[in-house]
Each structure stands twice: as C-alpha cells, then as structure tokens.
Amino acid sequence: MEELGDRLATLGWVSDLFVGGSVATDDYTPRISDIDLVALVDGPVDTARQSTLMTLHRALDDGIAADLKLGCVYVEDAQLLDLRAVHPTWTHGSLVDRILSGVARAELVRYGYAVLGRSPLDVLPVMSDDDVREAARAELTGYWTWAARRPWLWLDPVIADLGLTSMARGRHTLATGELLTKTQAVECAAGPAWLVDQLRARRRGEHVPSPRVRAALIAWRDARRTVARAQH
C-alpha cells in the first residue's frame, strides 16, 4: 500500500489514497482478502491516465504486490459525493468502471485511514446509523436482488460463499446500523453447521470445498429471503 502511495504521489494528479475494506477493519487474511483502496484524483481519468494506472498496477502485481489482490478505485474529486458515478477501478488484474458503494464509503468513514494525503473524514461526510442502513439496503436491493433472480449464478462456489456472508452482513447492518466484517459474518451465516464450518475454514485459507449444488441452493434461498425483506 505504501509503495502504491509513493508511486501515485509522483504522478502529480493523485492527492489522496485511503485504505478501506478488511485491512481497515482489521479482518485481513493474506491471499484470501482483497486490499481495498480508494484514490482521489484532480480531474477525469482519461485514456492517458488510464494507461498510466494500468502500467503502474501491472508492475506492482508482477512484483511487490504479487498475490496480494490489491485493488483501487480512482475517484475524481468533483464526483466524490455522487453515489451513482462510476470510476476507473483496478481489480484482479483489470481496469473496470465501478461505483464507490455506500457500504465502502461507510467503511472508509468509520474505519479507514490515509496512506497518502488527508484522512477520509476530511473529505467524506459522516454517516449515521440510518445512513449505513440505507447503504446496506441499496446493495441488497441492487446487485443482490439481480443475482437472486438468477439461480444458476449460485453454482459458482465463489458467489455462494460471498452471498452467504453478504446476506449476513446486510441483515446485521439493517438491524443495527453497524458494519460486520466477513469473518464475523461467517459466524452469522444462514446455513447448516457443516456449511458454516466449511466457510470458516475457507476464510482461514484452507482448501475445503462444499457440495456444489447443496451450497448453491442454500445460498440462493438465503439471498431470496434476505433481499425480499430488504424491499420493505
């Protein structure tokens, strides 16, 4: 993270670099968790800037950041408060366009810190418990509602695992206004004990597969229930 901050600082158009996600919440598991970063830039990330960022990230991914799953959202400072704006995002070896979700913003405000520049609290508004609830509701009624309508997606073990923990996190946040880490979410997953044990093992980095169809059905049904409740 520090190396990325140093390299971005030399570009002259990146002012801040924030750490969010599992690193900020002290829930990071090497080679399992992603490293979620957010950078602020002084203007649009045009084609030339995108090329620069891709070259920079590929060099890191091939070197010091190999296997670290380092990702970064590049947010134009003028669009920082626009929840619908999409931003160039380096993730898993590619530059794609994504929003900076309300939940990601809540993690930054409540737990995030700066590697470069200002504190997240200096540039992002404070989020109340109700604000965080609405951020969680937006994720459940957005992407996860879309996914719940496509049962075949859940045959992917990655989606099944992510769905179970995301539903647990969403339910907890709607009820309390507080954020839940992925490790904590495993303990709250709506699955039988054998599946929770397997989720726990995978979170520790162990290669413990689950029965593909059974896990998919459990996760999909949980998502259907959870997103339906989030609509009301």
Language-model region placement:
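Helical scaffold of the NTase/Pol beta-like nucleotidyltransferase catalytic core
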Residues: M1-F18, A48-Q50, Q231-H232
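Long, highly charged amphipathic alpha-helices
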Residues: E3-L4, T52-A59, D222
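A general structural signal for alpha-helical elements within enzymatic catalytic domains
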Residues: A9, R58-D61, A228
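Catalytic metal-binding acidic patch
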Residues: G21-H57, K69-V73
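Short, solvent-exposed loop/turn segments at secondary-structure junctions
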Residues: A24-T25, Q79, R169-H172
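Conserved NTP/Mg2+-binding pocket subregion across the NTase superfamily
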Residues: M54-L155, L164
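Nucleotidyltransferase catalytic cores
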Residues: A114-H232
